Amino acid sequence: MTKLEPYLAWGQIWPLWDVFTHAQVGYAHVMGNPSDRDVNDEWFWRTAVGRTFTFGRFGRTVTPMVEFVGQEEIGRNTPTEWDVVPQVQIPLNRRQHVRLGLGVRYPLNNYQTRDHRYMAYLLWDWFDGGFFEGW
């Protein structure tokens, strides 16, 4: 299944509390013939709050955060799904431009029909160097 997901994003670092926030709102359009698919288009919104901790002489970092996720299918009479995603992002190399994110997505409602999901992502800030540089 292919989705087209345009979205608006906003982020802010709050120096007084040394935390960051990030928010998104968007629309997920499922590509293909509507009669051939078993999911509908949906609205989604996400908000994450976290803080980066620096350790050691060379500034290794760990970034724990919590994300709140909502999504609502269009065209179905189903309730909005709300989830919470505690997660952490850690650098994999010394240059810290390749990072691994790990989290678990827990449903806050409709949990009788929805299970928690383990999630992971790899982030490469290519401006700071090639993927295999800085290890």
What do these predicted regions represent?
Residues A23-R57, T61-T63:
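A mid-sequence, solvent-exposed acidic-amphipathic segment
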Residues Q12-W14, V25-M31, R51-F53, F68-I74, ...:
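Transmembrane beta-strands of outer-membrane beta-barrel pores
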Residues P15-V19, F53-V62, N93-V98, D128-W135:
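Short loop/turn motifs that connect adjacent beta-strands in outer-membrane beta-barrel proteins
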Residues G56-V62, V69-N77, P86:
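Long, repeat-rich segments with strong aromatic
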Residues V19-V25, W45, V62-V66, V84, ...:
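Transmembrane beta-strands of outer-membrane beta-barrel proteins
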Residues M1-L4, R37-W45, T78-V84, R114-Y118:
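Residues that define the transmembrane beta-barrel architecture of outer-membrane proteins
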Residues P6-Q12, Y27, W45-R51, P86-I90, ...:
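Residues on the lipid-exposed face of transmembrane beta-strands in outer-membrane beta-barrel proteins
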Residues D115-W135:
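Outer-membrane beta-barrel "beta-signal"
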